[in-house]
Amino acid sequence: MTTTHGSTYEFRSARPGDAEAIEGLDGSFTTSTVFEVDVTGDGFALREVPADPPLVKVFPDDGGSDGEDGAEGEDADSRTFVAVGADGDLAGFAAVSYSAWNQRLTIEDIEVAPGHRGKGIGRVLMRHAADFARERGAGHLWLEVTNVNAPAIHAYRRMGFAFCGLDSALYQGTASEGEHALYMSMPCP
């Protein structure tokens, strides 16, 4: 058990019985700012701008697995870590995978339930991911985040992540069309 901001949580590897709660976790967010992306022939620039009215983002059900097997089907280079509240309910999770060829641990997904945000759960889940990265010999951690998720971008930067790339076409043809994928990385601590 770990106490963060006065609340007690159990942090552990996911179990098969956690799969339904992981799939059903509310990953939506509301933000009053977004990162505007200016793409030029020579690169790109980011600028945080107000979102008025505040943007509410609900991620659509992707209709299947995209490599994030949750608590089921994990291999030696994949893990899902969970945070469980004192009430036994899932408070958050982080699904990660290691790629040996580039010594990268990818944060496939990290979500914290709305009622548990701001309590350090994401930071502790990321520490578990970093521990797993070190076990695997990873040189860095890497993730993708939409430019409209300013709360997550700020959290990742506080954790030590820095911008390392952009994909302006990743979300074309999806419910997130018009958004840009921002890539962030940090050396394995």
UniProtKB/Swiss-Prot annotation:
Keywords: Acyltransferase, Antibiotic resistance, Transferase. It catalyses: streptothricin F + acetyl-CoA = N(beta)-acetylstreptothricin F + CoA + H(+). The keyword NADP does not apply. Residues 55-76 are annotated as: Disordered. Stable at 35 degrees Celsius. Rapid inactivation occurs at 50 degrees Celsius. Residues 44-189 form the N-acetyltransferase domain. Its EC number is 2.3.-.-. It comes from the Bacteria. Optimum pH is 7.8. One of its GO terms (molecular function) is acyltransferase activity, transferring groups other than amino-acyl groups. It is an enzyme of class 2 (transferase). PROSITE patterns: GNAT. PANTHER family: AMINOALKYLPHOSPHONATE N-ACETYLTRANSFERASE-RELATED, AMINOALKYLPHOSPHONATE N-ACETYLTRANSFERASE-RELATED-RELATED. Belongs to the acetyltransferase family. GNAT subfamily. Involved in resistance to streptothricin, a broad-spectrum antibiotic produced by streptomycetes. Detoxifies streptothricin via acetylation of the beta amino group of the first beta-lysyl moiety of streptothricin. This is Streptothricin acetyltransferase. It comes from Streptomyces lavendulae. The gene is sta.
